Amino acid sequence: MNPNLRKILEKQHYKIVGSHSGVKACHWLKEKLIHNRCCYKEKFYGIKSHRCLQLTPTINQCTQNCLYCWRYQDFTEQELESFDEPEFVLEKSIDAQRLLISGFKGDERCDKKMFEEACNPNQVAISLSGEPTIYPKLAEFIEVCHKKNMTTFVVSNGTQPEMIENLKPTQMYITVAAPNKEIYEKLCAPMIKNSWEKINESLDILSSLNTRTVVRHTLVDKWNIGLENSGEGSSPSRQISSKFVDEYAELDMKAEPDFIECKAYMFVGYSRQRMNLENMPSHEKIKGFAEKLSDLTGYEVAGEKKDSRVVVLAKDKRKMKI
């Protein structure tokens, strides 16, 4: 790993694992330990925020340079020339998580039982940074997690369909951050050829996977949800492009996911060098978008979490909890 990149990541409180992986304690893990406030994944799907291990097997490898990404992108690589074994990545990631949260043990606000549980995670969020499907042994890594009775969420940008069709996580996400190819190429800045076509192929594959599936729309105001000429002070629903919602609905129906997450871009990290605060949609606008998408897809609005600016739609909300 580039030593300058390592310094940047460590300053951001990442723990580097091996040669290409990383762990960072999630904001909501800390909130659960100190204030007993959970993330939207616990509220919607039932996983425990304080027992979630947030990691990436590709800390600096990606196929896109999305403008809204919080990642430092100057050292981005598109492949892994050599890679660590899945057992090593998981074991060292758990060790890293324990180090990251060790300071909470002496905090009188932290529940002791909850802290001990946090030191033994039972859920792995394979996202955080980079594109996880670049890791050639991702399928094996998921199997290693499951053998240890850990649930797995994989968040992918969908540009590697040949990998996605072989994955069996507990819950498989494809992020669709644009309604069409033109906006996708401007907003997501793909670094490989035919990326939009590959995402569409992944959406086709998603409908056939024998696991829980999610399409996530990361929504960026003035880019992939709002209209530049909507008018100052107009209502959130009037600031949403019906054409865009129609196009998103078409993509969603291709994938037939169990759930659709409509989530606001958050003005954090290095995205602040590429975006403005006004690009972060209000929760009201996200909710308006989700309601329009619900009307078009037939999916039910099944939950929302205002402080995360996210709304989830479900094909069958009785099946939301894992």
Place the predicted regions along the sequence by residue.
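A broad, low-specificity signal marking well-ordered, structured residues that form hydrophobic/aromatic
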Residues: 23, 53, 124, 213, ...
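Hydrophobic, Leu/Ile/Phe/Ala-enriched alpha-helical segments that form helix-helix packing faces
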Residues: 93, 97, 101, 145, ...
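Conserved AdoMet/S-adenosylmethionine-binding subsite of the radical SAM
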Residues: 109-232, 236-276, 281-284
